[in-house]
C-alpha cells in the first residue's frame, strides 16, 4: 500500500532540502565514529610520547645516579688506598720517658734499625734468671700507655724490653708492616746481646701479635704470648670494609695465619670473648693453626683492652712458671 500523500510529500520535501534520511544518519554516525577514533588515536599517540619522554627522563636520572655511584665508589676506594696506613696506625707522637710515665726502673735505650731508622726500647733487667718480656704493643698509643702492666711485671721480677715503633712516641719514620718487623729485629738483637734467646718471651698485643708472630717465625725464643691476635690484618680489614676489594688494596696484611706454623716455641693466646675489634674467632682459628705446645685462655667477660682486669696477668704468670704445660 503506497504511503499517504502527506507522508510522500514529507519524504519528497526532505530529499529536496537535503535533510538526511536513514542513510544520512548512518553516514553521520560513521563520520562521528571516525572522528572519535582519530581523536583516540591522537590521544594514545600523545600519551605514548609522554610515556617515552617520561621513561627517557627516568633512564637519564638513573644513568646519572649510576655514574655518580660508580664515581663515588672509585673515589672512596682511592681515598682508602692512599690513606690506609693512617687508618691502621694511631700513634701517640709525644715522647714520654719511662720516669715520666711512672716506671723509673726502666732505662731508655736508642737503637738503629737495618734501614737506618732511629727507634728506642725501655729496658728493665730481670731479677736472677727470670724471663725477659720483649713487648710489642698495639696500633694505638705508645709504651707509656702500658705502664701499669709493665709495673706489675717488673714488680714480679720479670725483665722488660719494650719496643717503641717508628712513628710512635716522638720517633721519626712512618709505621708499616716491614718497618715494624725491622724495628722488632733491632729490639731482638739488643735483647739477645744481653740475654740467652731461651730467656726471651715475645708478647704481642693486638697489632703487635702480627709483629711477634713474624719475629718468632724467624728467630729462636723461649716462649710466645699473643694477646687478642688476628689471623691476619687482612681478615680484620675485610670484615670492616666488606664492600671493598681489600685483598687487592691492603699493603700491610700481617699474615699470621701463614707464619704461625713456623713458630715452634710454646705459645699462649689470650682473648676476650666480647672483643669487638679482633673477634675471638680469629684467636681461636690462629690457635688451631699453631704448633704444640700451645694454650689458649678465654676471658668470658673480656673485651679488647681490658684483659688485665679479667686475670690476664695471672694466666701469664702460670704460663711462665710452666703451670699451663
Describe the predicted segments one by one.
Residues 70-110:
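An N-terminal hydrophobic leader/cap segment in hydrolases
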Residues 197-206:
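Alpha/beta-hydrolase fold nucleophile elbow
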Residues 210-265, 309:
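Hydrolase active-site cap/lid region
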Residues 263, 269-271, 275:
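Short beta-strand/loop motif that positions the catalytic acidic residue
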Residues 279-288:
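Short alpha-helix in the alpha/beta-hydrolase fold that links the catalytic acid
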Residues 290-305:
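Catalytic histidine neighborhood in serine/cysteine hydrolases
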